[in-house]
Swiss-Prot record:
<feature type="binding site">
    <location>
        <begin position="10"/>
        <end position="15"/>
    </location>
    <ligand>
        <name>ATP</name>
    </ligand>
</feature>
<feature type="binding site">
    <location>
        <position position="92"/>
    </location>
    <ligand>
        <name>AMP</name>
    </ligand>
</feature>
<dbReference type="Pfam" id="PF00406">
    <property type="entry name" value="ADK"/>
</dbReference>
<comment type="subunit">
    <text>Monomer.</text>
</comment>
<dbReference type="GO" id="GO:0005524">
    <property type="term" value="F:ATP binding"/>
</dbReference>
<feature type="binding site">
    <location>
        <position position="31"/>
    </location>
    <ligand>
        <name>AMP</name>
    </ligand>
</feature>
<comment type="pathway">
    <text>Purine metabolism; AMP biosynthesis via salvage pathway; AMP from ADP: step 1/1.</text>
</comment>
<feature type="binding site">
    <location>
        <begin position="85"/>
        <end position="88"/>
    </location>
    <ligand>
        <name>AMP</name>
    </ligand>
</feature>
<feature type="binding site">
    <location>
        <position position="123"/>
    </location>
    <ligand>
        <name>ATP</name>
    </ligand>
</feature>
<dbReference type="GO" id="GO:0004017">
    <property type="term" value="F:adenylate kinase activity"/>
</dbReference>
<feature type="region of interest" description="NMP">
    <location>
        <begin position="30"/>
        <end position="59"/>
    </location>
</feature>
<dbReference type="InterPro" id="IPR027417">
    <property type="entry name" value="P-loop_NTPase"/>
</dbReference>
<keyword id="KW-0963">Cytoplasm</keyword>
<dbReference type="GO" id="GO:0005737">
    <property type="term" value="C:cytoplasm"/>
</dbReference>
<comment type="similarity">
    <text>Belongs to the adenylate kinase family.</text>
</comment>
<keyword id="KW-0547">Nucleotide-binding</keyword>
<dbReference type="InterPro" id="IPR007862">
    <property type="entry name" value="Adenylate_kinase_lid-dom"/>
</dbReference>
Length: 214
């Protein structure tokens, strides 16, 4: 079961990725984790990536695709894998296709921008412990205070409205075209395109996914 997840930042991909991994016993492949692991292991691609990063440049699609090819050849990917955060662009999707990576399911989580902004702007964090809250969905016992220590909660820079809207802008210009790309792929190949309403309760979205993948 080879799956690609699509959806804007804050659409709930991470939560459902965890569910899919546990339910179907397949690993989540994150390009960031792969890069860090390759650099740490000092592989040939890792060395190339490190040189590029040290020079303050972006790692090329060629290096990322090479890392993915190495990663999916590993034993734990025999039953499949979950690609999260890749592809982000049409050229990356083309590269994956040219490499002969067949995709069984593309799963899109659909959530309106304003809902994502509300979700993320409502997040509060206790930085020393990493505990997170939400003013609406998971409020602390005392407003603005961590449940355990009573220390102040903060809004992380990543969760500020202007940052969220900027990230959504990048998503719409770069990644949203993949929705059309994979919709077309589904019409022409064995890839199935599944779209879920990401505003539903987490358990309901998980149940919908399980039903669709049955």
């Amino acid at each position: 079961m080879r799956i690609i997840l699509l959806g804007a930042p804050g659409a709930g991909k991470g939560t459902q990725a965890q569910f899919i991994m546990e339910k179907y016993g397949i690993p989540q492949i994150s390009t960031g984790d792969m890069l860090r692991a390759a650099i740490k292991a000092g592989t040939e691609l890792g060395k190339q990536a490190k040189a590029v990063i040290d020079a303050g440049q972006l790692v090329s699609d060629e290096i990322i695709l090479g890392l993915i090819k190495e990663r999916i050849a590993q034993e734990d990917c025999a039953k499949g894998f979950l690609l999260d955060g890749f592809p982000r662009t049409i050229p990356q999707a083309d590269g994956l296709k040219e490499m002969g990576v067949a995709v069984d399911y593309v799963i899109e989580f659909d959530v309106a921008d304003d809902v994502i902004v509300e979700r993320m702007a409502g997040r509060r964090a206790h930085l020393p412990s990493g505990r997170t809250y939400h003013v609406v969905y998971n409020p602390p016992k005392v407003e603005g205070k961590d449940d355990v220590t009573g220390e102040d909660l903060v809004v992380r820079d990543d969760d500020k409205e202007e940052t969220v809207r900027a990230r959504l802008g990048v998503y719409h210009s770069q990644t949203a075209p993949l929705i059309e790309y994979y919709g077309k792929e589904a019409a022409e190949s064995n890839t199935k395109y599944l779209k879920f309403d990401g505003t539903k309760q987490v358990a309901q979205v998980s149940a919908d996914i399980e039903k669709a993948l049955a």
